[in-house]
Amino acid sequence: MYRAGALVLRSATLRRTRFLAAHQNFATISSQRSSVLLAKSLESSIGGAGNQKKFYSSKDHDDPIAVDDSLELYKDLGGMSPIQVPADMPNVPILAINRYPLFPGFIKKVDIVKDDNLKALIRRQLSLKQPYAGVFVKKDDENKEETIVSLSEVYPTGSFVQIIEVRDQGSVLELVLSAHRRIRVIEPIEDVVAPKTDTPLNGRRARGKRAGLPPTPPPTPPLSTPTSAPEASATSPEEKEEKKDPERKGIVMVRTENVVADPVPKNNETKATMMAIVQTIRDVVQFNQLFGQQINLLLHPSQNVIDNPVYLCDLVATLVQSAETKDLQEMMDETDVSKRLKIALLLIQKEKAVAKLKHDINKDVEKKVQDHHRKYLLNEQLKVIKKELGIEKDEKTTIIEKIDERMKTLAVPEYALKVINEEKTKLQFLDPHSSEFSVTRNYLEWLTSVPWGLTSPENRRLSHAKKALDEGHYGMKDVKERIMEFIAVNLLRKSVGGKILCFHGPPGVGKTSIAKSIANALNREYFRFSVGGMTDVAEIKGHRRTYVGAMPGKMIQCMKKVKTENPLVLIDEVDKIGGAGFHGDPASALLELLDPEQNANFNDHFLDVPVDLSRVLFICTANEISKIPGPLRDRMEMIDVSGYLAEEKVAIAHQHLIPQLRKETSLSADQLNIEDSALEELIKHYCRESGVRNLQQHIERIFRKAALQIAEQQPEDEQPAATTAISENSDAEPVSTPSDPPTFTPEKINISTENLQKFVGRPKFTSDRMYEVTPPGVIMGLAWTAMGGSALYIETVLKRPVDVTSDKDGSIETTGNLGDVMKESVRTALTVSKGILAREQPDNKFFDKSHIHIHVPEGATPKDGPSAGVTLVSSLLSLALNRPVVQDMAMTGEISLTGKVLPVGGIREKIIAARRVGAKRVFLPAENRRDFDDLPEFMKSELDIRFVSHYDELYEHLFQ
C-alpha cells in the first residue's frame, strides 16, 4: 500500500515548504532545468543536516543539488542528470493514491509495499530509462490496496509524473514523483516485458551524445496487441497462470491521453478572478505566518505567477487543507480554465474561513493560557510576600500547627505521641508535591482524629433509661432488663465500661431499632455498620499504608465520627458475615475486636498504633446463632429477642405503627379509624410472622388507599394551592406560601373486618391448621424456625396392606426434605415405638411386616433437628393402633432410645405457634418448665400445658 509519510505534500507545514520552495525557483529559472530544481525543492525533506552528496548538471557546475546520503539513487537514472520529458507517452504504469490529487508542477512521495508486480514494473521502467507513471486518485478513501482491479475505482483524470528519486529497500520501494501534466486514462493494458537489445557504442544515441545533441526520448513499451509466436513462447508459466485469472490480477499498466485545457479567455472577469484568488491567498497567509514570506515572494508581480491562471489554480489546490477529494478532483477534471478559476476561488475562500476560525481558536486558547500563567505567577508572588511579612505560612507549618491544635484537647498516650512526633519531623523534610508527603499528612490526620481519652457523659439514671426504652419499643423484657443491669453496674463502679451483647431472633422484631433506643437511654453516641456479606478483613482492620488509597477499618472510622471512646456500636447481621477467602477471614478478625481481653489494645493495620476499645458497648444482631462461628459466639452475651404474640402486635400497632403513619400521611383519627377486630384479622390471616415489619407494610397500604379515597372525594377547585408572595423589591425572588386550608370535610373512613379485604387484598392464610380432625397416624408437632414458631404435622401411612404371611421384614420411607438429624430421629422413634407396642400389645406384629411411609408437609422447606422425636413416636403408634389422638393437641420434645423425653429450644416461639393454630393442650419436656415459667402470663393463659419426662406418661394421655 502507499504510505504518505512525512514528505507527503498534503501534510501540514512540511508539504507547503516543498511546494513554495519549488515554485519560487520555477519562476526564476529556465524550463530546461525544471526537473533538477524540483529535486532541489525536496532539499528540506530528503537533504537533512547530515552527510550529503552533491550532484551537478552537465551545464552548470555552480548549482549543487544536496541529496541525502542514505538515499540509494537508482543506478540507471544517471546521477540525477536532466532528462527530457516526452510530450506524449500514452502507455504508463498506474499508481493509485488516496485522498488528494497530485497536480502538475508539484511533488509527492509514494511507497510501494505490497504489490510485487507493480514494484517489478517500476524497476523495469527505471532500467529502461523510462521513469514515468500516471497518478490517479481512488474514489474510496478507505481502499488501501496499491493496485486496482477496475478503472472505476479511480477518477479518470490524473497526472503524468516523473520519478525523480528512488530508494529501493527490497520489500519497500520509495518513490519521489514530480507531476508534469494532466492525463486521462483510457483503458487498461497488459504489462508485456520487452526484449532487451544491445545498443552499440557507435549507435545514433551515442553519436548524438558525443555531438552534444539533446537525448532522444526512449521508445515506449509495446501496446497490448497480439504477440507473435516467438514473443508468446517467451512468456513464463507464471505469467500464463496470471493471464488465466485476470480478476485477481491488479491493473498496473494503462493507456492514457493528454488533457489539453481550453484557451484562457483574456477578459476582465478572468483577471478579476485571479486577483481575488491572489488576495485571498494573501489573507490566508496572515493566519499562518510560517510561510508568509515565501508566499509573498511567489505572488510578487515580478514572478509572473499571477499571470498564469493554470498554475495559479494548481497552487490553490495544493494550498487548501480542508477541501474534500471530490472538490479537488473536480478542479483536476475541469478543462475550462474560467470554471477552474471559479472553483479555485471557492476553495481558497473556504480555506480562509477555516483558517480564520482556527486562528481565533488558537488565539483564545493562548489568551487563556497566558491569563492562567499570569495568575499563577501573581499567586506565587503573593505567597512569597505574605510569607515574608508573616501574614501567611507555608503548607508544612500550617499542617503541623493544625495537628498541634488538635492534640491540645486530647490525652494522647505516650506510645501514640511518640509516633506523632516522628511523623511531624518526617513531614518537615518532605517535598509538598511528593506522594510521600500526602501519605504522611493523611496518616497524621487520622492519628489525631482518634478521640484519645475523650468520653461522653453517660446517663446513670435508671428512670430516664427505662422511659427511653419503653417509649421506643413494646415488650422486649429481657433486653430492657439487661440494659438496666448494665447501667446499674456502671453506676456502682462510677466509671464507663463496655460490653458485648448479641440480640438474636426472627426478622422484624426490632433488634436493630432497639440498639438506637439503648444509645439514647445511655446517652451514648451511636454508630452502625453491617458485616453481612463482608469478605475483606481490611474492612475491619484497615489497609496497610503501602497501598494507594489505604484507609483505616470501620472501628477507627467510627471513633473519628463519634469523637468519643465510649460509643454504642451496632454490628448488624453478624450471622451473615462472609467466610474465609482470598482477602482473609472477617469472622476471625472480629475476634480481636469483640474480645474484652484484647480490644483494650486493638491494632488497626493503617494506624499501626494500639487503640483502646474496652469502653465501647458492642451490640450484634443475628437471625440464627447457629451460623455464627463458635469462637465468635463464645465472646458474646446472647439475648433472645423472640417474636410477638397477636396481642403484642395489636399493642405495637396502636402505640407505634399507626401514630407514626398518621404523622407521615397527615391522616387524623377523624379521617381514618382502624378497629381492633380489623387489626386482629390482619394479624391472623395476613401477617403471621414473628415480627411486625409485614404488619407495618399492610397498615401503610391501608393508609395510602385511604389517602387516595379522600383526595378523590375533594373537589379540584378546593384543593390546597400555593400562593406566591412577592416583596416590594422587584429583584427579589417570589416566595411560595401555603394558602388557607380548604373548607371541604371528607367522609370518615372506618376499617373493619367487612371492608379490610378491599384495602389489603385477599387473605394469605385462610385456615389456622391443616387438619380440623386428625386421622390415625397424623400428629401435630411444634417447630422453631428463623421466622418464629410454626405447626409441624407428621403424617404416617402404610404403603401397602400388611401381609403377615410374607417372609420379608417391614420397611420405612421418609419424605419432606428432612435433614440427617431428623432422619436419625425417625429410626430412633421406630425402635421406641416397637418396644412400646410389644409391651402394651404383645400380639400386635404391625411393625414386623409393615411398609411405612412418613411424610412432613411443606416439602420445599428444609427441616432438621431432634425436637420432633415424641411427635414421630406418637404418629407411628397412632398408625399401629389405628387410633387417632386427642384433638386440639400439640407436642414437642426429643426422644431417647429408652423413651426418655429430652428438652428442646424455642419454647416461646412454639407456644406462640400453638396459640396461633388454636391448640388447647401442649405437651412439653419436663426440663423445659423453667423456660415456660419465664413467659408472660397472657401467653400462658388458655393453654393446658402438660410436662412429661418419659414417653410412657405421654402414652397414657394419648391412647388410654
Swiss-Prot record:
Asked whether the UniProt record includes ATP-binding among its keywords, one would answer yes
- The biased composition feature labelled Pro residues covers 214-224
Binding positions (ATP): G505, P506, P507, G508, V509, G510, K511, T512
Lon proteolytic domain location, by residue? 773-960
The record ties this protein, via InterPro entries, to: AAA+_ATPase, ATPase_AAA_core, Lon_bac/euk-typ, Lon_lid, Lon_proteolytic, Lon_Prtase, Lon_prtase_N, Lon_prtase_N_sf
> Where does it live in the cell?
Mitochondrion matrix
User: What HAMAP family does the annotation carry?
Assistant: lonm_euk
| The name this protein goes by in its record | Lon protease homolog, mitochondrial
